[in-house]
């Protein structure tokens, strides 16, 4: 071995087979690269295939979902990377993200809080082909009143009455382009027919409702007396009642809508085995009972309760989703 500072060996001292070895190495290099690419295809990004993690996009309220997910992790050792969404645009924003990621899925499990967007995603091929999604428990769309300002007997018996002059400037609702409010209005279109529905939407908007950022805000408006009545979700009414707010839900009618939670596994989920475990866990009766106990859900037997409200033809609702949504934009986003 040459000492430090010594002249480098001359070319005549280079090993005679140097070029041959170099040529062989260059020949092997493309095959090594191909092998690496194949391995990356089989196990992309290494840690993403960990058996101890699952990514879930969640539209259920974070305050209700987190204890359930913590219980799942404690039982299985699988960490849940949870992505939640905002009150104002939840479900729609998550749905758009899942649609955008179809070619390179980042999510394993979708925990939805209403049915329409889940059906839309299923129709768009976002979920796996078999055992793709299921409904889990239910809550409902309700009218909420301020009990200090009106009695149940004084409350309207139909949503059609909300366009009467007596309710001018007295009704609160969330933006009807997102979440359960959009689903409810689109289901009403399916029941009433397009002409009656469009006329009602226009008359309702002309009656100066408070259109606010989310169903919990609807209940707050009613609780504070800023509105006498609101169109919202049963779990938001329950949350306000726990805090002592003077609000009450009107009984279910033929115009009410039962809204199940949904659970789905994404097609080509990065973590299929943990995804299946979470999918099964969220369907357990005891998990549903926990959500009912905190009034995030009203019950677990959707089939037995479905007769209490609207029963939309979901295929027709999906078929008309885009034009009907455009009508809602034109009416409520002036």
PLM features: residue spans?
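An extracytoplasmic/periplasmic, membrane-proximal ligand-sensing/linker region
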Residues: 195-197, 299-334
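Flexible hinge/capping segments at coil-to-helix
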Residues: 151-167
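A bilobed periplasmic-binding-protein/Venus flytrap-type ligand-binding module shared by bacterial periplasmic
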Residues: 142-149, 259-274, 290
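Periplasmic-binding protein-like
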Residues: 169-176, 281-302
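Short beta-strand->loop
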Residues: 128-135, 160, 229, 245-257, ...
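A structural signal for short loop-to-beta-strand junctions that line the ligand-binding cleft
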Residues: 105-110, 126-143, 160, 170-173
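Early extracytoplasmic/lumenal segment of secretory-pathway proteins
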Residues: 48-120
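Ligand-binding pocket segment of bilobal, Venus flytrap-like solute-binding proteins
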Residues: 176, 180-183, 187-252
């Amino acid at each position: 071995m040459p000492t430090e500072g010594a002249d480098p060996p001359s070319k005549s001292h280079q090993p005679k087979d140097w070029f041959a070895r170099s040529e062989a190495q260059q020949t092997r290099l493309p095959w090594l690269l191909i092998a690496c690419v194949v391995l990356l295809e089989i196990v992309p990004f290494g840690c993403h295939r960990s058996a101890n993690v699952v990514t879930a996009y969640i539209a259920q309220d974070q305050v209700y979902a987190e204890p359930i997910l913590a219980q799942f992790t404690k039982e299985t050792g699988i960490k849940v990377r949870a992505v939640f969404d905002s009150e104002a645009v939840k479900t729609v924003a998550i749905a758009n993200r899942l649609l955008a990621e179809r070619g390179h899925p980042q999510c394993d499990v979708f925990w939805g809080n209403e049915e329409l967007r889940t059906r839309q995603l299923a129709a768009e091929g976002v979920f796996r082909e078999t055992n793709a999604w299921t409904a889990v428990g239910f809550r409902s769309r309700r009218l909420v009143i301020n009990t200090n300002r009106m009695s149940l007997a004084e409350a309207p018996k139909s949503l059609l009455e909300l366009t009467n002059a007596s309710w001018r400037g007295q009704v609160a609702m969330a933006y009807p382009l997102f979440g359960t409010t959009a689903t409810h209005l689109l289901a009403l279109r399916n029941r009433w027919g397009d002409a009656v529905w469009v006329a009602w939407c226009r008359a309702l908007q002309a009656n100066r409702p408070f259109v606010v950022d989310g169903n919990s805000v609807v209940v707050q408006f009613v609780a504070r007396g800023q509105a006498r009545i609101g169109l919202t979700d049963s779990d938001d009414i329950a949350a306000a009642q726990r805090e002592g707010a003077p609000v009450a839900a009107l009984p279910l009618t033929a115009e009410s809508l039962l809204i199940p939670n949904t659970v789905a596994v994404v097609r080509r989920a990065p973590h299929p085995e943990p995804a299946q475990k979470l999918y099964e866990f969220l369907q357990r009766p005891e998990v549903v009972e926990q959500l009912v106990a905190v009034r995030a859900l009203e019950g677990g037997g959707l089939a037995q309760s479905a007769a209490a409200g609207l029963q939309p033809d979901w295929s027709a609702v999906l078929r008309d989703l885009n034009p009907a949504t455009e009508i809602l934009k034109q009416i409520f986003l002036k």
